[in-house]
Structure formats: C-alpha cells, structure tokens
Regions:
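Retroelement reverse transcriptase polymerase core
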Residues: 1-142
Length: 142
C-alpha cells in the first residue's frame, strides 16, 4: 500500500502481517530506551541530527529471502531486493546497524534512522560529526 511521507514522497509498504510475519523468525535486537538514545547526547552546545535516507532500503536482502517479499500491484508482481518497511524484523535489523555505527563513538546517539551528534564547541562537534560520518561511509550507510 502506498503511504505519503511528511516530505510529500511516497513509500510503498507491504502488509506482511497476513503473509510472512506470522511465520517469520523475527530478529532479536533490543530497541534503545529514551535514556540509551539521549544520554550520550545531553549537555552539548552544538547539535547535529542526521536523518538517514530511505533507511531500511539501504540494507540489501539476501538472495534467498527475496522470494518471500513479493508485492502484488496493478502493474504486476515485484520482488524487493532491499529490506522493506513493514516486515516485523526490519526495525531490529536496522537498529543493529545503527548501533554498530555508533559503537565506540563519543557524543553520538541514535534510534532507527535518526542519529544525533553533539559537541561542547565547534571543534569538538565537528570532530564528533566527522567520526560518525566516516563510520557511516565505511559501512555504506547514508
């Protein structure tokens, strides 16, 4: 089903509750609490919020998983090649990636597709921001 995003673009979302969600082995990865998300980024004078572009769609699906994620449209059947929005495992899979991006970085916190970076001054802030951006580049996330 098409969903209108806040920026006016359209997100295609399958309703997987009636197809694969009930037989899916759901990935287990804890979602962060508010304290986990915001504690690392409290007290900074300078703040950057990165909103990852089409977050889930940056994750390539394994070939053998693609057959289970076919959607039926008025134009025919289409098979996802990247992690779709709406599958029960998608949030945990993507949060695990976000957590690995932030692991070991100072003054960085994030949940889902939002990553926050702080610094006490411009120099510290830009150093923290560059560290986060470099980690994202090395992991192929934008």
């Amino acid at each position: 089903m098409p969903l209108l995003k806040p920026d006016g673009s359209v997100r295609v979302c399958g309703d997987y509750k009636v197809t694969i969600d009930h037989v899916l082995e759901v990935s287990e990865h804890p979602m962060p609490t508010d304290d986990d998300t915001y504690h690392p980024v409290t007290g900074g004078e300078k703040v950057t919020k990165l909103d990852l572009s089409s977050a889930y769609q940056q994750v390539l699906l394994e070939e053998e998983s693609r057959q289970y994620l076919t959607i039926n449209t008025h134009l025919g059947l289409f098979r996802y090649t990247h992690l779709p929005f709406g599958v029960a495992s998608s949030p945990a899979i993507f949060q695990k990636i976000v957590d690995s991006i932030m692991n070991g970085l100072q003054a960085v916190g994030g949940i889902s597709d939002d990553i926050h970076i702080i610094g006490s001054n411009d120099e510290t802030h830009f150093c923290n921001l560059e560290g986060a951006l470099e980690r994202m580049r090395s992991m192929g996330v934008s």
